[in-house]
Amino acid sequence: MMTIEKAMRTLRLPNPTTPEDLESRWSKVLTFGDRILLAGYYYNGIGQPSYFGAVYEHLDDDLSCEGTIGLRAVSEVEFEDDGHAIAWAIQQ
């Protein structure tokens, strides 16, 4: 698993943010219970896995798209597709 600080710097993941902001920046964002899951793409070289998963959690009582969320877990860039990245995020 990647550290939060490294993910923010390398993958340019915002922290804190809102679900609305994530959805405008990334194409694969899902609400899953009280968590927000993200599958992201980061070019890792020809023939290399280029997808990662990330998990955000609500930081306040506002569960709308404008509530504040914080980054809780990020995988390494290790998946060959976004489905496997989301599967990783679900298991966190």
Q: Which stretches of residues belong to each language-model region?
A:
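Negatively charged, low-complexity tracts enriched in Asp/Glu with abundant Ser/Thr
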Residues: M1-R35
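Generic "edge-of-domain/loop-turn" microfeature
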Residues: T18, D60-D62, H84
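Amphipathic, interaction-prone secondary-structure segments
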Residues: L22-H58
